[in-house]
Amino acid sequence: MPSRTSFDPGTGPCIISIAALFTRSHPYIYMASHAHRIEVHYSCDPRLQMRTERFRSLGIPLRELHLVDIYTIATSKRDFSPEELSQIGAQLSNPVVQRYSVDRPTEADFDHAIEVGFLPGVTDNVGATARQTIEDYFGFQFGEGEAVFSSQLYLAAGDLTPESLEKLAGALANPLINRIHIKSREEYGKKGMDAVTPFVHLDDPQAAGAVGLDLSDADLARIGKEGILDPRTGERRGPLALDLAQLHAIRDYFRGLGRMPTDVEIESLAQTWSEHCKHTIFASAMDDDVPRGLYKTCIQAATNAIRKKRGDADICVSVFTDNSGAIIFDDEHLVTCKVETHNSPSALDPFGGALTGIVGVNRDTIGFGLGAKPCINIYGYCTGDPDTEPALFRGKNRENPILSPRRIFEGVISGVGIGGNCSGIPTPQGWCYFHDRYVGKPLVFAGTVGVMPRAHNGRLLHEKQALPGDLIVMVGGRVGKDGIHGATFSSEALDPASPVTAVQIGDPITQKKFSDVIVREARDLDLYRSITDNGAGGLSCSVAEMAKESGGCHVLLDRVPLKYPGMAPWEIWISESQERMTLAVPEEKIEAFMDLMKRRDVEATVIGTFTDTGRCVVEYDGTTVMDIDLDFLHDGLPEKHLRTLPVETAYPEPDFPCPDRLDDLLLAMLARKNICSKEFISTRYDHTVQGGHVFGPVQGSGRVQTAATLTKVVPGSMKGVGLSQGIFPTYSEIDPYRMAIAAIDLAIRGLIAIGIPLDAVALLDNFCWCSSDEPERLWQLKRAAFGCRDGAVAFGTPYISGKDSMYNDFSGFDADSRPVKVSVPPTLLITSIGIHPDVTTAVSMDAKFEGDLAYVVGETGEELGGSEYLAHIGIEGGVVPPLDIEAAKMRYEKMTGAIAKGLIASAFPVAHGGLLIALAKVAIAGKIGMDLAMPGGMRPDRYLFSESPGRFVVTVAPSDREAFEMTFGDGAHLLGRVGGATFRISAGKTLIEQPIRAMETAYKAPFGGY
């Protein structure tokens, strides 16, 4: 079948084989013995309106668009009869709203047909589900070389030039994962599109080989950057992210053994020692005042100090030692939490990267202790403005353009949504942040909360221990080339050499099956002793990490089930193919375990044994391909001593005029993308599944994005899990220390506002830094880490988990082929989790009753540094607002006490955009006006737009005024009353007078068409 990257619609059918855009070889597409196409289309397709409008917005002259779902059934051992194919079509369609055809093209009015499918080896979840549907219906199993492939056919009508066709194809497909087949109407004719079956076909696998390291430093550095030279292809295999000191350590170790390392051993060490896995920057000594590294000095030390001070009141159960952190929920249950990042893969394939991120952190929950049940998902996206189209390219001469911010934004939203919705996990909590420095590499945060009993059958379920003699069992999906070098890839900046194989697509259906059987059955039957997920580094990391529990491992790599034949041993060992867990199963229980997995349709394979030899030994087809001391594997990487260089941060508070009226400014600020409604995300994410919904992502009749959500996770219990977060990237360049304090404070305040006590709150930290090899960036990192330490200790809120991603940079070219580097702003996400003692007393954000009193609780300063207001008027700099934490703590204790007593009708933390935006959101949420007067002594715009931390907007019933004001004293400031349909603020004269409806329109307009 022809393959080319340009096309002329008038000269014949064309496949845009995206694989041809890259120098690395890809498996090829070939025809099966029997191939049949089933085409399914809606009578009225609900997907088309939004897609058509989106394509037209790109300047594509579409008159009409039709969408057809394609299922290509490929078999070799048997063929299906026409009657059977018709039965399959009926199973794959809904007769009420859909029609299907078998081996007959769909008829419609169109000018060009564009079919988009997956490249060989890319996970095809829809195809896999269709295959299983057919197997269940007919009661037989597809064999090797047989499959069902899904694709989508777009029938486009309009005056489409080759340029507009190319633009449409680019909007429909991602060249890293998709193939495109285009035909004109004449070529489509009566036969339609071709039945393409993208099986993977690889050459015979190459045996593990020795790699000589007695090379010059220049040649060693090339191995570290580009990978091992493949003797068969003459190409480098992909980044190892090993520096010279690490390569010297590896060379010296194997010199001591009297042999050269194998490629399996070098690849394994690269995964284990990667920044992604070892967090070397946080672990390394820094300057003279941080000899133990930032992690031990700031994050771990803060948590240890807090836990020691709390004594018997400590809420922590497991911190920093397992896949997630855990706190006490009640006397019988624990809740776990972990937030991961999946930035580099999401830059290449936003949908697959985000989907893999969310199902991966789900596995961190399943892999905590002996298995927690995922009960809440969390998301966060930092991208460029979706309305911009930056001209950035990975190659010169405008080759290999980066994906647009909108493409990334829409892709990551879909990925996390599919992951949660298909897994039956609610996704109530999340946020978005936009900045032009995220155009080169987005930040994609994915988190999961889990719940589990504290003990079962006399065992503490948060404890696990693989023992010598236990069998190593892999469950879930099979291993393929997807995800190879994922850990090392994410340990570097994105550049033109970033590997295609690092892209993965998760399979939530497969994961849901083994998740349920592990958490609901195998765990409580005591069928295994330890469990962890196959994430970064694949088997090389999961097995080797568990081997520390027993003291060694012996792996038979040729037993690992593969997606297709032909993979080399090193590829099998480090592949990050998704939906896999590794378990330690006692030999006497293996029969019961395997029988249970079979009955639940979960593939499970014994791939070796845990030992106490102190070594990680891996065999392939009877040959030892890896034999390394565990001590060297895990702790042999050389220590670093990092140096920082202080950054000048003296930014004066800017001087600029204040408008006489602030009406237009209010509406414009409400429409800023970091402030406005993102309800379209919340409506796509199921946040009520599992039945624990208390406070969801939007609140009030006006449906405003909330700062915190609340979910019941144990049936029958009135306790709930609250989630919130804090993030201030624009503060980082000005004052990273205060930035960290502000993020911690906002994360805590979100929970305080719904009634969760401060002593029931724990934190998670996610550092996403840039250019971490630059001393100036390390100084900012150091200041932020010390802010994390001081803020957590002062508030008494321990860290239970965290993650750092240190190279969030893009290196490429602009439209004129000039080298360009785009680095994200130093970004710290603080996530908060807290236990609400009684969800029936929780308070929502929306103003509720005519005549209620509106207050601001806390003190307002004049600082505007890094604020949304200054960003809106185009001014950088200023002073980041400080926080008196001791005063804030006292205020927060009063807040939760007042909420518990029913003195507060609504509460909302002041955050991005300042007091005015918080007041406006509370009013919009309640669809009720306010008549407010601001105090004198401060310029109106500074008072209303300052983002001073530690504050809340609250409404109080007049009957509770006396008790409320006695509780807070001079810490609460009466602003006015709730009522009417107009939002009015005065300061001796009218500053703002706007209908609530106009404010709601402005707030919801930016993403109204999504």
Regions picked out by a protein language model, each given a short descriptive name:
Residues 62, 121-123, 143-145, 151, ...:
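Glycine/proline-enriched, intrinsically flexible loops and inter-domain linkers
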